[in-house]
Amino acid sequence: MNQLPEKLLAKGNEAIAMAAIDSGCLLYFGYPITPQNDIPEYLSKHLPALGGQFIQAESEIASINLLLGASSTGARAMTSSSSPGISLMQEGISYLAGSELPGLIVNISRSGPGLGGISPSQGDYFQATRGGGHGDYRMIVLAPSTVQEMYDLTCLAFDLSDKYRNPAMILGDALIGQMKEPLIRQTCKKMDLPPKDWALRGAEGRKPNRIKSLYLQDGELSEHNWKLYEKYEQMKKEEVRFETFYAEGAKLIIAAFGSMARVSKTSMEMAREEGMKVGLFRPITIFPFPQKALFALSQKVKPFLTVELNTGQMVEDVKLSVDRDAQVYFYGRPPGSLPSPDEVLEEIKKVYGIEHSA
């Protein structure tokens, strides 16, 4: 490994793989699928030289269960896939959450439903933010919009996952995963984390640890689920992250995440050059969603335009978050093509004209 910090040109997928190594993750389990294959390719070359393990499993189902086993020993471990592969992992992710085990899952999402295609999509928002598998659980979900954030948020995701003993997800897409941008690779900032005294590392001289998600005694499962609920509420209080641009004094706020936040930011700048007071609200954590921040903003600014690379998913969280008097408009593009900044600008003009005409 080169001496850090190091400035280089890298793909978003490669940035995730580098951050995993720099976060102390030496265990990777996965199965190939486009457009995330740069992640396992990079790690297959570098992990063995660092004393780590790279395992190409026979399926995504096997991959997530290998992650569960590795995590139960207290090791940092990860997997990555793309939309249909993530769907195959849902049972295992539910078991991770139910067993209170950390672990990083990366979804470089692609078009669906079904086999779909390999173009970028934000159609996995509901699956990521609502749990996805069976049972009443949530994942920590971070949504990068740059290659640098692919690196930085991967470092953060490992720490948050360990802090809360809960699976975390990086929700990217084919655009950010495949694009190249300047990247500053540096030592990951690490939280002060508690020891993993729950891990299965042998029981000489102490009572054995047990990791499970099966609770059959009267009231036991209910108590466990309330414990998980309190953990998710703590995440909402402590881990919300978002970014705003020109929100102060704006007369229209665009809400967008990930790759569409990039497009929307350019459209916002074009609109401002034409004299329109337009701002941008970008959630970085999509679970926990920045509900309170959006509500506070909606008391000053109305209306909102939610822009997504799907037919309408995050817009539901925006509507639930804003003041009841705030109008929320939606502009979406089904997977298969990416809207240009000019196309989003036309929608901005349309909404701005409706709301601010004489």
What do the PLM-derived regions correspond to, one by one?
Residues 44-46, 94-97, 155-160, 185-188, ...:
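Short, solvent-exposed amphipathic alpha-helical segments in soluble enzyme
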Residues 120-173, 356:
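Conserved thiamine diphosphate
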Residues 1-131, 138, 146, 334, ...:
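Thiamine diphosphate
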Residues 165-244:
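Conformationally flexible catalytic loops at phosphate/diphosphate-handling active centers
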Residues 242-276, 281, 287-293:
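Redox- and metal-dependent alpha/beta enzyme cores, enriched for Fe-S-associated oxidoreductases
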Residues 11-15, 229-252, 265:
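Glycine-/acidic-rich phosphate or pyrophosphate-binding loops and their flanking alpha/beta elements
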Residues 308-358:
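Peripheral docking tails and interdomain loops at the edges
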